[in-house]
Amino acid sequence: MTLEAKLRCVRCGYEVSEIKYVDLCPNCGGLLITHSSGPLRRSRNLGVWAWSSNLYASRMRPRITLGEGNTPLIKSLNIGKSIGLTLYLKDESKNPTGSFIDRGSATLATALKYFKIRSVVVPSTGDLSISVSTYLRRVGISSKTYIPSSVTLSKAYKNLLVSDKVRFVDSYEEALLKALKNTQIYGAVVLPNNPFLIDGYRTIAIELVHSIGKEKPLMIVVPIGDGVLALSTHYVLKDLQLQHKILGVRACRESPLLRDIYVTKPILQEYLKELENLGFLEIVNVCDDEALEASEIMVKKEGFLIGPVGASCIAALRKVVRESMRKVVTVALMSGDPLQDPYVIKALLEKTVKPNEQVVTLGFTKIKILETLAYGNQTYPYMLWKELKQKHGLNLSRRSVYKHVEELISLGLLKVVSYEKVGGRVRKVVTITESGLKLLS
């Protein structure tokens, strides 16, 4: 059966034209991305399947959807004018789980069901596993998730709700390693570079071109993450022979506020580097104060209740706007991260956040440490490590837990009440402070 849309290796050009489940290029192990030579034809199908003629997974059944895609493309009335750009805002927070990832989860779930894969393992920083596991619930495929213990509380709870098994580990790198060790146990390991995920991501660029047209060059601003969104956007626009550039946004450092867009070594680094060398990609670093300011501007100038991660694309644009950009149509992607964290909202209201000052947004592990000590308990960090492992399934190293404790002390949320000698070792005894109790309440 000949398909209009084919998987093609970015590295060697090998094409997978028949229907089969593959993770990487069978020829060289490179990245596979869907290429479609056909016109953009929108059908009446729901979700990403409105563009089924341009999707590799289109011949698979049943097609899975939760109504993802077809998200609002809103012309900026004030921010674009203030920086001299023709600016549109693509609101991906309107997807079912609040992330553009839902587009890929629809095509991935369809493929997994079609190929009768019954279980998967997903290493994630939070959003990927929430989206994939949510869609797999519809087709009865079980999922196991590995996520860093530093993930925000809301993402930790969402993962616990939708995944069949969740394991908390020290870092995303450890999550990747543990997931890859499960390849013989689970039917598939879902990594960010999975071609069936990317198949669905492509519909973002397809929708943009369908709405805006092909007359003017495009600049698309996206969070860089692992690189899949930038690459999928580029290859859609390349297939359509459109002049374009991708502005990739990355956090300037790791912080609780922007941890979702802080990636030191993207999985697809070699492909991103090639795009940079060819002039299709420019990466911009955004810091906490810049993202917070952009979030405030989005609320007050455009009526967008979007958090710092979602507003980071606007922060990047404000940093690099130049005369040559005034001749193109610019689209900034707003994905997930609705403005709902009370500490971020408080900071915006009081305007107390200054450069290099952190907003206190705690991850799952730190919240659990505070909760453990919230009832007047005093204990050693070692005992905290044991309780986190036994009661909450946090499979962390002792060093990692001790580091969390030290950070909570530096934030004024824990304090050292005494030192005791146990088994020849001097151990500190810690307890929660009034500030820590207030934060929990």
Where in the sequence are the language-model features?
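Short acidic, hydrophobic short linear motifs in intrinsically disordered regions
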Residues: 379-389
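N-terminal juxtadomain amphipathic helix
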Residues: 1-65, 70
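Active-site/ligand-binding loops adjacent to catalytic centers
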Residues: 170-183, 239-308, 345-357
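Active-site/ligand-binding-proximal alpha/beta "capping" segment
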Residues: 180-240, 275, 292-301
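A short, conserved structural fragment
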Residues: 409-419
